[in-house]
């Protein structure tokens, strides 16, 4: 066996079954384009043998896919026909179930014959509250279990065929059953309508009997709407008006002031309270301006305003001249010092001479 170089692993076998037909065709097109390049094929050591092998494999896989696809297309209309028949059978089953449910509803509505519409409605409400009916569905048979005895009328019973039977035989049987059920429902509906009688509302006997039979109706009293309850509660417990918001006032002080106002103080006490509030504001907050150190603004005539402007301009020019002279002196290093041309000796001479004059005057 020839030893492979280190780090080299043989390529894994390609699984063409996982790839789609479009991917296989794309690979086939690329391999054929490589095979048509003669210069590239001549440079290969195997002269394009691997490429030709892969092309053959791809063609075989594509042909196999096409064959499988053709077989599935042959069975496509059969599957569509089966689906349509299955849908038709399910529709027939649902129609039968609806007819049976309507039949059962008509049976339960005819528990008490020859009674008024009010009695029928009250019996429906009591039957829903006291004796609820239970419907049990087993296969295609339905049984009605109620708290009281119920007169059930004959209804068509449906039996299902085996799933292995043909659909063509199943459809006409169901259609005949549906027709029978619809005719029985119509006849039942007509009989129930004939049994119902409209009673006169002026007769007090039937109303009394209906109320005696159903005491739950007497206990029901008309309830007040919610907004009426809220209005009555608000009238009994009135809410005080909200206090106005005041700046720079603590909530406790505001509550105290509101309580004092409600008690009804004298005008003198209210003035005292205002004075204290102002003093508190002046001491604590900076909401007020400081007292003025100068007189407030005054109206001046045109002559006075011109004189003030000229004076201000002169002062400004003098200040500018002083600043310019100071800057020039600093730039030229000129230092202004006291000048004494006689020096210190002249001063001393004068002082000594004065002493001599004093001595001579003493001797005299």
UniProtKB/Swiss-Prot annotation:
Give the signal peptide as a residue range, or say none if absent: none
Coiled coil region boundaries: 15-39, 297-331
Q: What ranges does the record list as Polar residues composition bias?
A: 121-133, 249-258
* Molecular-function GO terms, alphabetical: RNA polymerase II complex binding; transcription elongation factor activity
What residue spans carry the region label Interaction with Pol II?
Answer: 223-294, 311-336
Q: Where is this region: Disordered?
A: 1-23, 121-142, 200-223, 235-278, 335-364
Q: Compositionally biased, Acidic residues: which spans?
A: 354-364
What family is this?
A: Belongs to the GRINL1 family.
Spell out the protein name for this chain: DNA-directed RNA polymerase II subunit GRINL1A
> Organism source for this protein?
Rattus norvegicus
Q: What is the lineage of its organism?
A: Eukaryota, Metazoa, Chordata, Craniata, Vertebrata
